[in-house]
Amino acid sequence: MAQNENQIGVLGAGLIGMSWAGLFSAFGYDTTIYDPYLKKQHVARNEISNIWASLDLLFDNLQNKKEVKFSDKLDDLKGASFIQENCPEDFFLKQELISKIERIVSQDTIIASSTSSFMPSELQNGCANPERIIVGHPMNPPHLIPVVEIVLG
């Protein structure tokens, strides 16, 4: 399965997921947000615009912005080289989503969770390639505070 080094998948369109997506897309990454409840895309697009406006105040030359794509199909993340998971802090939900996305993306794709509650070893349990599942827990909001706690399994 081919992956695109410039393609990022974001799981979850909540506050943290939107912040990540706005940051990635502002710096030119092809970013797709997966959320099964994408009923309010216009609200999400407005939030991305607000994030970009904040970043424009911090950086002089953000000229490579890419439109964020929204999807309710995990398969739309197939070519991503990096996945940032941001679903609610429900262990079984996170584990199920990580297990599903792991079967869709390349074996080399890094899957990071924004969790503040679970260890990577817990999220890796039952995964085919557990070494690529990490915690990438941001300080909030990630588009404004450039600090990410990275925890390996």
List each language-model region with its residue ranges.
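NAD(P)+-binding Rossmann beta1-loop-alpha1 motif at the extreme N-terminus of oxidoreductases
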Residues: 1-51, 69
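Short, flexible turn/loop "capping" segments at secondary-structure junctions
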Residues: 25-26, 77, 141-145
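Hydrophobic/aromatic beta-strand patches that form the interior of the parallel beta-sheet core
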Residues: 32-34, 84, 134
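Rossmann-like NAD(P)-binding element
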Residues: 36-39, 54-110, 118-119
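Hydrophobic packing residues within well-ordered alpha-helices of enzyme cores
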Residues: 44, 101, 123-124
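Rossmann-fold dinucleotide-binding core
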Residues: 110-153
